[in-house]
């Protein structure tokens, strides 16, 4: 049975069983603390569900009297606590599924940290699993958890693993990648190839030679285009595994922040529609279309297209990179390396990103802008202010800033006044907090 994930709204409406006429509930829960999150942090004794929605909360006697029928399932919690489903505001379901289903997991969460040699050993061991014509694909390398600190793979390092098999690695941030020279060759890049735009960079050394380091997802596209695409069955299986794992942790609604970033908007929208048409997802999805994948004048999908379970509600752009990857745009230089004068880069000029955002804003789309650094946050807030100028109900537009990592008090105040919602990825602070504080940006 699917339970409606928007428990909070239902509980706010359902103040007591007496608020409803008698009915026939599908399920009634009782026997443990039932947390309503109704503003007063109240707990109730019982909860009734009908047709996948909460129809009553209140005292056990009242709920059972009003809603129990012969076919009603009665669930005794036996002291366990029932809480609203968790809402995960920022995920990349297809990206995650693609990486975890088809790539080598190189994540290292504990001491001792990896070195370039240990990472290379892990990759070398996977060569035997690469089919003819295939690529060795990995993810999760984290320079902030590599010894020495911030050590990164190069094309030369990856060539030591193989010069025949193309290798492509995405690091833990998702904003930086590494390739060997075989991959560079197959992608058709040379030392004279210009950067792809939208913030993407093919990093070169002092002599103008490609190093194998890629900055921002647009720089991945030339390589992904040459990689064997997963079959529909492989991709759907991986996506369903991801959705099921989310549900197993209590997550009932997610915001998918990159629809179209891997296989194009139309294909990824079709993938989601296919999954939900078969009732194969245990969680609800709210989709944000990947702005960089949208052609000028795109209008194939209208704002809020979908239903209660799957709805496409917004468009997302990325204004800077990752803090841990030293690519977020700051107003002051990073602490690393020592005496650095580098403060990151904006992916777009002010007028450029405003011009991309405005047509979708005018169509009624919600907008979400990835901004980690305070310089990027300034740019986004200023552009939002221009968009909202003359809008009588800015709160209806649900403008979001993703991450909002390196911020200051004036930016918080400005966001509040404008009705802009910072969407914090607090897990980043937990995971990279020590690196942020001790090495990269300070307290």
What are these regions (language model features)?
Residues 309-327, 420-429:
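Non-cysteine beta-strand/loop elements that form the S-adenosyl-L-methionine
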Residues 290-296, 402-411:
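Short, conserved secondary-structure transition motifs
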Residues 274-284, 304-310, 362-363, 385-397, ...:
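Secondary-structure transition/capping motifs at alpha-helix termini
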Residues 1-7:
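Bacterial N-terminal signal peptides that target proteins for export
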Residues 23-30, 35, 39-298, 317, ...:
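Divalent metal-binding segments
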Residues 14-16:
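N-terminal signal peptide c-region/cleavage motif recognized by signal peptidases
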Residues 406-443:
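Active-site-adjacent C-terminal substructures of enzyme catalytic domains
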């Amino acid at each position: 049975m699917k339970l409606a994930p928007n428990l909070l709204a239902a509980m706010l409406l359902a103040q007591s069983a007496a608020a409803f006429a008698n009915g026939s509930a599908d399920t009634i829960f009782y026997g443990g603390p039932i947390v309503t999150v109704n503003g007063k942090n109240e707990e109730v004794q019982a909860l009734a569900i009908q047709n996948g929605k909460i129809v009553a909360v209140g005292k056990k006697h009242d709920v059972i009297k009003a809603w129990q029928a012969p076919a009603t399932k009665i669930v005794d919690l036996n002291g366990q606590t029932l809480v609203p489903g968790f809402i995960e505001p920022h995920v990349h379901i297809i990206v995650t599924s693609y990486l975890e289903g088809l790539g080598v997991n190189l994540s290292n969460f504990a001491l001792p940290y990896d070195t370039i040699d240990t990472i290379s050993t892990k990759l070398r061991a996977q060569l035997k699993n690469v089919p003819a014509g295939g690529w060795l694909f990995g993810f999760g390398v984290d320079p902030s958890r590599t010894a020495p600190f911030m050590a990164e793979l190069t094309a030369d390092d990856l060539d030591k693993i193989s010069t025949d098999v193309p290798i492509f690695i995405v690091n833990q941030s998702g904003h930086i990648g590494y390739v060997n020279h075989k991959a560079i060759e197959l992608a058709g890049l040379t030392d004279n190839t210009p950067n792809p735009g939208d913030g993407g960079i093919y990093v070169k050394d002092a002599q103008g030679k490609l190093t194998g380091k890629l900055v921002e997802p647009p720089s991945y596209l030339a390589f992904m285009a040459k990689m064997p695409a997963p079959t529909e069955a492989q991709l759907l299986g991986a996506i369903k595994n991801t959705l099921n794992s989310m549900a197993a942790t209590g997550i009932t609604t997610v915001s998918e922040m990159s629809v179209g970033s891997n296989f194009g908007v139309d294909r990824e929208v079709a993938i989601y529609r296919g999954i939900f048409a078969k009732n194969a997802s245990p969680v609800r999805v709210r989709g944000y279309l990947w702005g960089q994948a949208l052609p000028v004048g795109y209008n194939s999908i209208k704002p809020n297209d979908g239903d209660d379970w799957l709805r496409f509600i917004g468009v997302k752009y990325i204004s800077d990179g990752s803090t841990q990857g030293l690519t977020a745009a700051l107003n002051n230089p990073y602490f690393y390396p020592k005496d650095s004068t580098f403060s990151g880069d904006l992916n777009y000029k002010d007028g450029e990103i405003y011009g991309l955002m405005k047509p979708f804003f005018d169509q009624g789309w919600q907008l979400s802008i990835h901004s980690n650094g305070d310089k990027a946050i300034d740019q986004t807030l200023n552009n939002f202010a221009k968009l909202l100028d003359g809008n009588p109900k800015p709160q209806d537009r649900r403008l979001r800033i993703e991450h909002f990592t390196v911020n200051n008090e004036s930016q918080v105040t400005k966001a509040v006044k404008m009705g802009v919602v910072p969407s914090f990825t607090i897990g980043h602070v937990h995971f990279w907090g020590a690196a942020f504080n001790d090495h990269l940006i300070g307290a």
